[in-house]
Amino acid sequence: MKKEEIIENPSVFKPHVVLLGAGASLAALPNGDANKKQLPLMNNLVEVIQLTTLLEKHKINPSGNFETIYGKLRNNDLKKEIESRVFQYFNSLSLPETTTIYDKILLSLRRKDAVFTFNWDPFLFDAYQRNRNVAPLPHIFFLHGNVRIGACETCDNWGRKSGHCSNCNQKFEDIPLLYPLKKKNYFETNQYTALSWKSAKCWFSEAFTITIFGYSAPTSDQEAVELLKKAWFQKSNREFEHIEIIDIICNEQLAMRWRPFTPTHHFSATSNFENSRLWNWPRRSCESLFYPMTKGIPCEAFPLNLKKANDLNELQTSMKEIAKFEDKK
């Protein structure tokens, strides 16, 4: 099938659901944020946020993974101080004015799709804000809270942290970040998080395909992985559905890690977003799977050939040209 036919004749399939982990943010901004501030991962967060002296003052070994260190904290005052510093650091991060992978992800999906992130950083939210008038964007959800958002528990609305509820005009309340504990009690922490996980179960159960980007499924997230797996198989044994993994880990390790999600081995992996289904068939990813799978018709790829790779305006203009055909459906 020629690319023009795919672009100009979009179909309404079930959702393409994207799950983001810390690796997605690192891939998006490998050299740091707009101000060159380094993106912390769990294995270097103590060093990047400069928690070493604070931990040593309380006779806690600062070396090792933040998940392990945080799980051993017993001093509530120390825990609050660490949480405050973590929040302040992530809240200070910002997107550059140039194109990032976050812009590409959002503009490559449609309103029928969804993005779920475990990340505390503001990049998904900020990318959504600057692209929301370009084309209909996917729904976005923050499974571990986020530094940019607040919520109204009365009306179940959420938005920018400093904003007000569009329904009752109350100022949004802060949403706490979920820290790396083995038992997170997703449905008991706060209303926004509980609703986000209910949404995750619904979207994963209905998904036509899933992309998992930079999420390592750590030990502290086994509760999350199990919830998502149950949702994925809730309505189907997934004999035909496809999962794509974007990660720098070798394919054999990825296949082993995500094998419970792919009983029929409909699985592909790439280390680069530009090789992904999202980028090769922007806003038509489900079509690119459906026609070969059901009719034996291969679909010509059409990755955007941008003259200036980092020009956000050019990316937005190109995606708008693809999206205009969706209005006719």
Language-model segments: what does each one mean?
Residues I49-L54, F141-G150, N157, K235-W258:
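Short, flexible loop segments at boundaries between secondary-structure elements
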Residues G23-L26, N31-D33, W120-L124, N146-I149, ...:
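Short, solvent-exposed loop/turn segments at secondary-structure junctions
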Residues N131-F142:
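A short alpha->loop->secondary-structure connector
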Residues M1-E5, L95-I101, K184-C202:
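A Trp-anchored, charged/polar loop motif used as the substrate-binding/catalytic surface
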Residues F142-Q191:
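Cys/His-rich short segments
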